[in-house]
From Swiss-Prot:
InterPro entries: AceGlu_kinase-like_sf, AcgluKinase_fam, ArgB, Asp/Glu/Uridylate_kinase, Glu/AcGlu_kinase, NAGK-C. GO terms for cellular component: cytoplasm. Its EC number is 2.7.2.8. It comes from Salinispora arenicola (strain CNS-205). The keyword Transmembrane does not apply. Pathway: Amino-acid biosynthesis; L-arginine biosynthesis; N(2)-acetyl-L-ornithine from L-glutamate: step 2/4. HAMAP family: ArgB. NCBIfam families: argB. The lineage of its organism: Bacteria, Bacillati, Actinomycetota, Actinomycetes, Micromonosporales. This is Acetylglutamate kinase. It is found in: Cytoplasm. Gene3D superfamilies: Acetylglutamate kinase-like.
Amino acid sequence: MSLTADLARAQAKAATLIEALPWLARFAGSTVVVKYGGHAMVDPELRRAFAADMVFLRYAGLKPVVVHGGGPQISSMLDRLGIDSEFRGGLRVTTPEVMDVVRMVLVGQVGRELVGLINTHGPFAVGLSGEDAGLFTAVRRTAYVDGQQVDIGQVGDVESVDVTAVTDLIDGGRIPVLSTVAPGTDGVSYNLNADTAAAALAVALRARKLVVLTDVPGLYANWPDTSSLVGEITADDLAKLLPSLQSGMVPKMEACLRAVRGGVPAAHVVDGRVAHSTLLEMFTSEGFGTMVIPA
């Protein structure tokens, strides 16, 4: 390669760094809660890219906190064990048998793998679950299908959050990685929807942003019309749109709505199938995905 071509490549890299400068200045010292899920969890290259993104945020002066789901891995393990599973209203029906698998996969597999990937870049990540240090307390929830309330078993909503353990880790320069299993006040363990848990944590931490990784480019106002992709939407407009959304997007957009109405300045849904999507959202002028802002 010629010297001119090498210089052009170097200048392009420098231009990218300079473009990020105002965003680095704006978000320095800010807490960012990132919900990790979808295809980004199952593709090896995307997993490595996500881990690198979190370390980049840490070195750039931000305070990333990761809340992960594990839907694909849970489904795979249930299939291997011959345990039937179903979804109602976008949420997994969680029997006691399914709950055992959920805990095993989230805490023992997905969380540990992500911690390991992040720590290939340095001793940053520490794994926690909602059962540790009273982080989350859950309350049983139901789902709605066609306007009817239905039972979904040991699925919980977040009743309370104690961020002491998380803030201690952040203050120590660590990257907390949270699995969403939590005890209820009734003594039963619950499977928290990771989107819901991420929103509650973002509010409790007074985070600057909530970023939710999905398997679509963002929110569509009129799915499957791909021209209806929404770049930015207010909380009030999102609340009006929620009843018409596809069931899989409802928990994600509800989480964004809860976060913004709880005081988080902005919540974002980004396409986790695109490598470094979190950085594209945080540090480019164009942004990426759909941003939810207060009314």
